[in-house]
Amino acid sequence: MTSQRTRDRLIQRLYEEGLSNAHVLEVIRRTPRHLFVDEALAHRAYEDTALPIGHNQTISQPFMVARMSELLLADGPLDKVLEIGTGSGYQTAVLAQLVERVFSVERIQALQDRAKERLVELKLRNVVFRWGDGWEGWPALAPYNGIIVTAAAADVPQALLDQLAPGGRLVIPVGAGEVQQLMLIIREENGFSRHLLDTVRFVPLLNGPVI
């Protein structure tokens, strides 16, 4: 269930679906997704589907992890990325292998504690975690070259726009219903450009930390 052939099949499927960043695909290939799901679901870890991780949250499908990572890195390597929604830590682990530093915010402490353990196990040491409200971002360490949000916001949080560096890219699902639009926002010299992309399904971005 975790064989190299199984992972290769997943990467081939992602490539056929239009993903083309070789570095992103290689990181997806070598990141052990089965470590980020419950043991009972490990046999489904390399399916291209979202899976439950408890607390009414999910681990994103590999396609969406790769897609959002590609969008974030489209202008080249980044040195400082803010992730809103640590969740299982899978997207965090992928980002940690693609950028210099990751700052990850999660409102559910139990999820973040487990994610920390997984990243330690994988010897990924360039991630700093914060337990808190994702709507607020992490202003103390701003600005960020890239911001990625792994839950859907009804509107784009102003705090995240404020924390985006000039030329920086924000990738976020936007919408209040079960179906949302993936949006790419770029901070330009005189404001922000917004680009509506894929139709997506994400859990909602909620307020307030939870133990």
Curated annotation (Swiss-Prot):
Pfam family, one: PCMT
One Gene Ontology MF term: protein-L-isoaspartate (D-aspartate) O-methyltransferase activity
The keyword Transferase is annotated on this UniProt entry: yes
One record GO biological process: protein modification process
Keywords: Cytoplasm, Methyltransferase, S-adenosyl-L-methionine, Transferase
Segments traversing the membrane: none
Function: Catalyzes the methyl esterification of L-isoaspartyl residues in peptides and proteins that result from spontaneous decomposition of normal L-aspartyl and L-asparaginyl residues. It plays a role in the repair and/or degradation of damaged proteins.
Family from the record: Belongs to the methyltransferase superfamily. L-isoaspartyl/D-aspartyl protein methyltransferase family.
Protein name (Swiss-Prot/TrEMBL): Protein-L-isoaspartate O-methyltransferase
Naturally occurring in which organism (per UniProt): Stutzerimonas stutzeri (strain A1501)
Biological classification of the source: Bacteria, Pseudomonadati, Pseudomonadota, Gammaproteobacteria, Pseudomonadales
Gene: pcm
